[in-house]
Amino acid sequence: VEVRADSRSVAALVDTYKDSMSYTNIKAASTKRSYDGHLSHVLRVHIGGKQFSKMFVSQVDYEYAQRLWLHIQDDVSTHKANHTFKVLKLVWNEGLRAGKVKANPFSLVRIPKLPDRQVMWTVDQIKGMVKYCDEQGYPSMGTMIVMCYEFCQRPVDVRTMKWSNIDGRTGVSNFIQQKTGKQMSIKVTNAVQDRLHLHKHRNSDDYIFAYENTGRPYTQDRCNKFFRKLADGYGLPEVPLHGQFNKDGSQMYSTIWLADLRRTGITHASQSGCSDRELMALSGHKNPQMLVVYAVEGEIESTNANIKRGLL
């Protein structure tokens, strides 16, 4: 016999969220897995002798939320605490809409912002990785790497690129960014154009990229896992994370991600002297302030300014 959680409990509220359209309509399986992982972890947390899952929702106030964040930060990391609170905000917002809670204490907690990720690919790593993908018989991943870098786009928008997005007469790729809904128009670059012949038009679908082992379009999970396998095979190194340290004070490291190609491309465009308007048109950012996180590796804007002044 299934034992249902007390209807007043946090566990019951999480069940309500998981039954909601907000949760069931999440497209990416990896996003759902991430949310489930954070919720599974936090529901088991004990503070003041009581498990979070068994607490009444009415007992979870601003003071408790602060204690919960500090507990997760101390037990795991700031990163984990921040991401857990992102999910708990969604759960409590659904509770507000369903009339099961009166306020969202997790929205009130001012969580510290972590340093922006500044991981970059080198040009040699890009060229080497593309060559390795081709040699291993996976040109689809090679072309996605080139397109992520040269188009300065997120992997999801490259992975789901269709032949119909590319205007055969003008050579311009027209698509809508999935995260922002922004309409993009980017002329196909020479390097991408030179690789399109490596990919076949299929009757089954219109996607440019298919996983060679199945002949079917990449899912988000397949793309991420297979990129990691190829990256490890090629030997992409782990790199230090700017301004982030482990509990013992040692430097925190990270693998290089496919998503880091977007930052690399935008930074390269900035170093090449592109204006804010040009960078916004290329990246899809809505305002120049959002570009600041991409201007990494050496005060690019100030250097460009002094070059234009003739001081460098």
Predicted feature locations:
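Short, basic (Lys/Arg/His-rich) helix/loop patches that form interaction surfaces
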Residues: K50, K131-M141, I186, R202-D205, ...
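Short, polar N-cap/turn motifs at the start of nucleic acid-interacting alpha helices
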Residues: N165-V172, M252-T255, S272-V293
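Basic, Lys/Arg- and aromatic-enriched nucleic-acid-binding interface segment
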Residues: T78, N82-T84, R97, V101-K102, ...
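Basic/aromatic DNA-contact patch characteristic of tyrosine site-specific recombinases
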Residues: V1-R8, T24, K187, G233, ...
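N-terminal core-binding DNA-recognition domain of tyrosine site-specific recombinases/integrases
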Residues: D6, D19-N93, A98-K100, Q136-G137, ...
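C-terminal catalytic core of Y-nucleophile DNA break-rejoin enzymes
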Residues: Q178-H197, D205-L230, W257
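Catalytic-site neighborhood detector that most strongly recognizes the C-terminal catalytic loop/helix
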Residues: M120, Q177-G181, D276, S283-K308
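C-terminal secondary-structure termini that scaffold catalytic or DNA-interacting sites
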Residues: E212-G215, K308-L312
